[in-house]
Amino acid sequence: MPKAKIITLTNQKGGVGKTTTVCALCGVFSSRNKKVLAIDLDPQGNLSFSLGASMEGLTIHDVITGKCSFDDAIERTENCDVVASNILLSGSELELNSAGREFILKEKLEPLKSRYDYILLDTPPALSILTINAYVATDDLIVP
């Protein structure tokens, strides 16, 4: 069974085009009839806003902290499925304090890999436990 390619957009600096690139890739891949999931790992939530996802419902914070599953948090938008983020994600750093915490995202993404062609991860402009989780889970890194 084919598995999704996970692509992470990352850079320690803000304003370099990470979110814009994720939005563009969503459009390109979906125009080629590819199934895409975009995950906003930045507490600022710019990807969520740009893709028209609600930042008031269940978010990646709820998934990472075990309050819900990815299936509960996925929202369908025009070009792709989205797991939104909001400022609450900032608190995840404090909640993720167990051994193996850098593998949480990878483990939670595994069941989704057979349902998508691409999973795109938009990271915050900092080296945090969320960014490390993205690095562990990813197949390819793009550093704009």
Where is each model-derived feature located?
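P-loop NTP-binding core
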Residues: 1-144
